[in-house]
Amino acid sequence: GYTQGDETNDPYEPLQHIPGLAVGGWYDAGDFDIQANSVLNTTQDLAYIWTTFRPERDQTLIDQKTKFADIHVPDGVPDVVELVQHGTLNINAQVENIGFVAQVIGQPQMHNYHHLGDALTLSDGLLYDPSLKPYEVSEDGLRSGTPDDRFVFTGRMSAAGIMQDIVSLAAAYPALKEYYPEESERSLKN
């Protein structure tokens, strides 16, 4: 499990919504947590694979804007480069919104850990509002009383942890430069 003390190490209050984090990254095998070490190390390893071997395989269409992926549909970008981008989208979002990569973006309750099926169905996609009754949706349709938003555990803040953030983004910079120059520069900047 994870613990979070009173200090969040970021500009947000405990349980306050942190915008911009629902992008990129990978879930752990067996649950739907997004762990820092998994995302950082996977992104770094994929970047090194690209810069060392340049595998040109392109069998997956990935559209980050619409969050759509389709296998066996080439899109002109090598799959490994798209995977590097998928990692940096998550890393950069955390660095820009929190200041560093959190220990984990995890499930809010034990019920979610035995969930089977598509991760999309873990949440209603609305911001949690404790003033609403469970499953009640606000009139504007943007908030609900369902406490299904992920928790961001930001107690990981350390010099050693931030070094891994830097190393992963630095490794991604040359891998992304040709196909995703904006994300490449964003990684270098962060």
Show which residues each predicted segment covers.
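Extended ligand-binding groove/face enriched in aromatic
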Residues: 2-40, 53-189
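HEAT-repeat alpha-solenoid elements in large eukaryotic scaffold proteins
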Residues: 43-46
